[in-house]
């Protein structure tokens, strides 16, 4: 029998200093003015500069969340870092993050779940809090600008750098936290979005072409249609499992991949547009970081109140994806 749940006790986010507007990218790709915003909803995004690191970006977001939660560092028992762009292939970046934040009693691991990584981390964190009654720091962060192929329009116009963080703490009210979750994978779309080189299947080599170390989106339309279907279907299942309808959702926080994608999923679910949290216009697509960044921003604009019901959903490379209903 459940005796506790989890509570979102603190939020944080961080972006690099450099803001890149559409005009700069449109000029480099030979696109007409306004092309990017019309097709993606993005007006600007943030890209890392020479001294920026993934762990540094994650640290800023994590510290903000810890301060917001007003929690002692010794109370954090686990640190989960969802990222596709760690500082190094080995070791993982999460132990360094925990060290810099002074989390001396925390375990720490990286999770590589692409754009849906935060949902996986959040679901695992909620289970840990319920089982062990100890707090968890969840951070999602990416520096995607260093993996963009500047000549490939599909990825060059979308991707951004950012970090978002949430602190989960134990809560005695069992009807809070994750009410339902549906995490899925479809490996038939494994190569739709990829960085070919760097793994054990294709290690870095002296004769490697530069593009193999950069992100490639093989078929943008296929990615769009699969992602919309995946996010719609998983969202419908978690609503059904939680015995809720779209009308019961207080805020809908989808992965900020593309404004048209969010609109399509929102329409499929029958969720009112004003309930949808949108940050893609100013921050672009930072993969797993978009949902916690959006949570931090919406909480700053209008604090999340106890009892609010959130619907979170994402889809990304792999393909991986899912949806979560979370009661604040």
From Swiss-Prot:
Keyword field contains Transferase: yes
Keywords: Acyltransferase, Biotin biosynthesis, Transferase
One Gene Ontology biological process: biotin biosynthetic process
Effect noted on mutating residue 153 to A: No change in activity. Loss of activity
Domain of life, per lineage: Bacteria
UniProt effect for mutating residue 115 to S: Loss of activity. Biotin auxotroph
A molecular function (GO) term: 3-oxoacyl-[acyl-carrier-protein] synthase activity
Variant or mutagenesis effect after changing residue 285 to A: Loss of activity
Record region (ACP-binding): 256-260
Enzymatic reactions: malonyl-[ACP] + an acyl-CoA + H(+) = a 3-oxoacyl-[ACP] + CO2 + CoA; glutaryl-CoA + malonyl-[ACP] + H(+) = 3-oxo-6-carboxyhexanoyl-[ACP] + CO2 + CoA
Phenotype upon loss of function: Inactivation of the gene leads to biotin auxotrophy.
Catalytic residues in the record: 115, 255, 285
Enzyme Commission code: 2.3.1.-
Pathway named in the protein's UniProt entry: Cofactor biosynthesis; biotin biosynthesis
Function: Involved in the formation of the biotin precursor pimeloyl-ACP. Catalyzes the condensation of glutaryl-CoA, an intermediate in lysine degradation, with malonyl-ACP to produce 3-oxopimeloyl-ACP.
Binding partners and assembly: Homodimer.
Record-stated family: Belongs to the thiolase-like superfamily. BioZ family.
The name this protein goes by in its record: 3-oxopimeloyl-[acyl-carrier-protein] synthase
Species, as recorded: Agrobacterium fabrum (strain C58 / ATCC 33970) (Agrobacterium tumefaciens (strain C58))
């Amino acid at each position: 029998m459940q005796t506790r749940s989890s509570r979102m006790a603190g939020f944080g986010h961080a972006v690099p200093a450099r803001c890149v507007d559409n005009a700069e990218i449109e000029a480099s790709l030979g696109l007409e003015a306004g092309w990017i915003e019309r097709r993606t909803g993005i007006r600007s995004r943030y890209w890392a500069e020479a001294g920026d690191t993934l762990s540094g970006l994650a640290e800023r977001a994590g510290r903000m969340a810890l301060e917001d939660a007003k929690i002692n560092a010794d109370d954090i028992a686990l640190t989960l870092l969802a990222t596709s762009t760690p500082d190094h292939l080995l070791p993982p970046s999460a132990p360094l993050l925990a060290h810099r934040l002074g989390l001396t009693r925390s375990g720490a691991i990286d999770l590589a779940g692409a754009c849906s990584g935060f949902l996986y981390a959040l679901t695992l964190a909620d289970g840990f809090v319920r089982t062990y009654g100890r707090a968890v720091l969840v951070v999602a962060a990416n520096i995607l600008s260093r993996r963009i192929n500047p000549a490939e329009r599909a990825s060059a116009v979308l991707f951004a750098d950012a970090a978002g963080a949430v602190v989960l703490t134990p809560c005695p009210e069992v009807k809070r936290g994750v009410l339902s979750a549906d995490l899925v994978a479809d490996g038939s779309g494994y190569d739709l979005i990829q960085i070919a080189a760097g793994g054990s299947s294709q290690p870095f080599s002296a004769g490697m072409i530069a593009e193999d170390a950069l992100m490639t989106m093989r078929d943008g339309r296929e990615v769009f249609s699969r992602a919309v279907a995946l996010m719609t279907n998983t969202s419908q299942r978690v609503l059904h499992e939680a015995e809720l309808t779209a009308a019961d959702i207080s805020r809908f926080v989808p992965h900020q991949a593309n404004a048209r994608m969010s609109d399509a999923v929102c329409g499929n679910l029958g969720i009112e547009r004003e309930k949808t949290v949108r940050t893609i216009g100013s921050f672009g697509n930072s993969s797993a970081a978009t949902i916690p960044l959006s949570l931090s921003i919406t909480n700053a604009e209008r604090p999340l109140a106890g009892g609010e019901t959130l619907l979170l959903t994402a889809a990304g490379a792999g393909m991986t994806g899912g949806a979560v209903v979370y009661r604040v």
